[in-house]
C-alpha cells in the first residue's frame, strides 16, 4: 500500500486547538469493524459500550514539560525538545537553531540562563545533552520546561494545558506527547466503569516526539518506526489471560496501549512462549494485513492524514471502513487530533 492511500481532506477549522470544558463532553463515533456501521454519540456512551468482564487497558505515562528555550554560549537562540531522558542528568533531544550545535558546545537553558548544559554527541537527528547542575533533569524541566503541545495545535502552551494535556491517571513521567484517547476520561467515569464490573489495567509507553514525524516514503512497507520505551507488567499479562478465559474483551484506550500490548504479543510469538511481561523499546509498525493478537476494541482519537496511526486503525477496522468513517467524521464536523473527539471501534474479525 502507498502512503497516499491514507490521505483525506481535512478543513483547518476541524483541528481542535483547545479541549472541551469537560473531559467527557467530546463526541464519540462508533465504528463496527465487521459491518462498517457508524453510530454518532457522545463520549459518555463508553459506559454503555463496555460490558461486565471486559478489561480496559490504559497508558499511564505522564507528559513531561519537554520543551525548553535557551541559547548557545555564542549567543544564538535555540529550542530543545526532549525525546527521552537517558539518565538523571542527560537527555536525548531535538534541537532547533540556526546551526546545529557541535559536540562540546555550551548551552544555557531557561529565560534567565538558569541551567548550563553541554552538547555531548549527535545521534542522527537527535542530540545528547548533559546538564552540569546537580539538579535532576525532571526537576529542571518542571522549573523551565513548557508543555510540548503538538505542532498542529499551533499556539503557545498555556497554564491550563499543564492539567488538560495529561490523563487523570498518569503515573510515570517520560512522554513528550499525551496518550490522547485517555484525555476523555475523568475520575467519575472511571469509577462508573469499574462499578459496572469492568476491570482496569495500566501499561506504560513513553510517547516520543517521533509520533509527529511524517512518513517520508511512498510505500508503507519501507517505513521504519521510531523506538519508544514500553512496560507491560505481570499484572497486565494476568488480567489479559483472565479476561480472555472468561470471554471478556480487551479494550485498548489509545494507539499507545495497542502498540504496548501487541509488542508483548509479538515478542511472545517470536520466542514461541505464552504472553509474558515486556520491558524495553518497541518499533512495532501496525498497518493493514497485521493480525491483532490481543486487542478486541479500541478507543482512539482521530489521526492525521497519511500517519502511521490511521494505518494502525485501518488494520483494526479494515481500510475501507476506516476511510469511510473519517469521511463521515469530516462531513459531520467532528473535532480532530489531540484535543479532539474520539472513536470506539470493534475489531474486524475477517482479514482487512
Swiss-Prot record:
Pfam families linked: Queuosine_synth (PF02547)
Major place of residence: cytoplasm
BP terms from Gene Ontology: queuosine biosynthetic process; tRNA wobble guanine modification
SUPFAM superfamilies named in the record: QueA-like (SSF111337)
GO molecular function terms attached to this record: S-adenosylmethionine:tRNA ribosyltransferase-isomerase activity
Pathway stated in the Swiss-Prot or TrEMBL entry: tRNA modification; tRNA-queuosine biosynthesis
Family matches, as InterPro entries: QueA, QueA_dom1, QueA_dom2, QueA_sf
EC number: 2.4.99.17
UniProt keywords, alphabetically: Cytoplasm, Queuosine biosynthesis, S-adenosyl-L-methionine, Transferase
One term under GO cellular component: cytoplasm
Catalytic activity: 7-aminomethyl-7-carbaguanosine(34) in tRNA + S-adenosyl-L-methionine = epoxyqueuosine(34) in tRNA + adenine + L-methionine + 2 H(+)
Family: Belongs to the QueA family.
Subunit structure: Monomer.
Protein name as annotated: S-adenosylmethionine:tRNA ribosyltransferase-isomerase
The species this protein was found in: Vibrio cholerae serotype O1 (strain ATCC 39315 / El Tor Inaba N16961)
Amino acid at each position: 500500500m502507498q502512503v497516499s492511500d491514507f490521505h483525506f481532506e481535512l478543513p483547518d477549522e476541524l483541528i481542535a486547538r483547545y479541549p472541551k470544558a469537560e473531559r467527557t463532553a467530546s463526541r464519540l463515533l462508533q465504528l463496527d469493524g465487521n459491518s462498517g456501521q457508524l453510530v454518532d454519540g457522545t463520549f459518555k456512551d463508553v459506559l454503555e459500550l463496555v460490558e461486565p468482564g471486559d478489561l480496559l487497558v490504559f497508558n499511564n505515562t505522564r507528559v513531561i514539560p519537554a520543551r525548553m528555550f535557551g541559547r548557545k554560549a555564542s549567543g544564538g537562540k535555540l529550542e530543545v525538545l526532549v525525546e527521552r531522558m537517558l539518565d538523571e542528568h542527560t537527555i536525548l533531544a531535538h534541537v532547533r537553531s540556526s546551526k546545529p550545535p557541535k559536540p562540546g558546545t555550551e548551552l544555557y537553558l531557561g529565560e534567565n540562563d538558569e541551567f548550563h548544559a553541554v552538547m555531548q554527541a549527535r545521534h542522527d537527528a537527535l542530540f545528547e545533552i548533559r546538564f552540569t547542575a546537580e539538579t535532576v533533569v525532571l526537576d529542571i524541566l518542571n522549573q523551565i520546561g513548557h508543555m510540548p503541545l503538538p505542532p498542529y495545535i499551533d499556539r503557545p502552551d498555556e497554564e491550563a494545558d499543564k492539567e488538560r494535556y495529561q490523563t487523570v491517571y498518569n503515573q510515570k513521567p517520560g512522554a513528550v506527547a499525551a496518550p490522547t484517547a485517555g484525555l476523555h476520561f475523568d475520575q467519575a467515569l472511571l469509577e462508573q466503569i469499574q462499578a459496572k464490573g469492568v476491570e482496569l489495567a495500566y501499561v506504560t509507553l513513553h510517547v516520543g516526539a517521533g509520533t509527529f514525524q511524517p512518513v517520508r516514503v511512498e510505500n508503507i512497507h519501507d517505513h521504519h518506526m521510531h523506538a519508544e520505551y514500553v512496560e507491560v507488567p505481570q499484572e497486565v499479562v494476568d488480567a489479559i489471560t483472565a479476561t480472555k478465559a472468561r470471554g471478556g474483551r480487551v479494550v485498548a484506550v489509545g494507539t499507545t496501549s495497542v502498540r504496548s500490548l501487541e509488542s508483548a504479543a509479538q515478542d511472545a510469538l517470536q520466542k514461541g512462549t505464552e504472553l509474558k511481561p515486556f520491558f524495553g523499546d518497541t518499533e512495532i509498525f501496525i498497518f493493514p494485513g497485521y493480525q491483532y493478537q490481543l486487542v478486541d476494541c479500541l478507543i482512539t482519537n482521530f489521526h492525521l492524514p497519511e500517519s502511521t496511526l490511521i494505518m494502525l486503525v485501518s488494520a483494526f477496522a479494515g481500510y475501507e471502513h476506516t476511510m469511510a468513517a473519517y469521511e463521515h467524521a469530516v462531513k459531520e464536523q467532528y473535532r480532530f487530533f489531540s484535543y479532539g473527539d474520539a472513536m470506539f471501534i470493534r475489531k474486524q474479525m475477517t482479514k482487512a
